[in-house]
Regions:
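An alpha-helical interface "stripe"
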Residues: 1-256
Length: 256
């Protein structure tokens, strides 16, 4: 099956259109901020959903009704917390709500609430973006970029991504998909090592640069037959670093 048919006619249809599918919302790549937030989804969730409406109005007053400034500062706080978390699963589990400027804001509504049942869960905004560019700039220069096939968001917050492979081109998720993910990660890790040598003791740059890989709940690759889940890709980092330092890195091993 051709990759575009797999992506558009099957997966995107299942994610967004079918009544027995996931009922996600598709959003455009140009609505995603440089720090990987779907700004309108985040804004909607913290300002219009049941447990956030009143709190948001109160919060907005502290910003003299400057909504743009509020959102920018709020995303900065979230981005920092994400960087301090092991991954997005732990971030969401530990930050179902946050206190911002003294005001409690919910970030996610769990299902099965004793009081609300699943009603609040239904207010969560699950979104996907096709062909979303990830670009990392350092000191005004582009260091790394790639474009995952599908990227997933929850209430405007990045969750993970998926790479698709097509047997039409004699490719498979097992071989080419996993290799593509490993190749992208090793390229990013090597570029990070080049700019961070001696300058990233606190790993601030790493937390920002490699977050799309290392913070993802999971990275998946799929074809028409199989799906593979890659977790904890950061476990490869020390090996990549060691082999780069002693010039023994086998780049051919990671070719997609």
């Amino acid at each position: 099956m051709d990759k575009l048919i797999l992506q558009d006619k099957y997966l995107m249809n299942f994610f967004t259109q079918r009544t027995d599918g996931l009922q996600y919302k598709e959003v455009k790549a140009n609505t995603v901020s440089k720090n990987h937030f779907v700004v309108e989804d985040l804004k909607y969730f913290i300002s219009e959903t049941s447990l956030n409406k009143t709190a948001y109005r109160k919060l907005l007053k502290t910003f003299a009704n400057n909504e743009k400034q509020l959102l920018e500062e709020f995303m900065e706080v979230l981005n920092k917390r994400i960087g301090e978390s092991m991954n997005m699963a732990l971030f969401i589990n530990n930050n179902k709500s946050v206190t911002f400027k003294g005001v409690k804001i919910n970030l996610f509504y769990p299902s099965g609430s004793i009081t609300h049942g699943d009603a609040l869960f239904e207010e969560n905004q699950f979104s996907i973006v096709q062909e979303l560019p990830y670009i990392y700039n350092y000191e005004g220069k582009k260091q790394f970029s790639f474009r995952p096939d599908i990227t997933f968001f929850l209430n405007g917050i990045f969750l993970g991504y998926s790479e698709l492979k097509s047997n039409y081109n004699n490719q498979s998720a097992h071989k080419n998909g996993k290799a593509k993910i490993a190749n992208d990660y090793q390229k990013a890790a090597i570029n990070y090592l080049e700019i961070a040598e001696g300058n990233d003791i606190s790993q601030t740059i790493r937390k920002d640069f490699l977050k799309i890989f290392e913070k993802a709940i999971h990275i998946t690759t799929t074809d028409v037959q199989d799906t593979f889940v890659i977790r904890n890709i950061s476990s490869q980092f020390d090996e990549i670093k060691a082999r780069v330092e002693d010039n023994s890195f086998d780049f051919d091993k990671y070719k997609a």
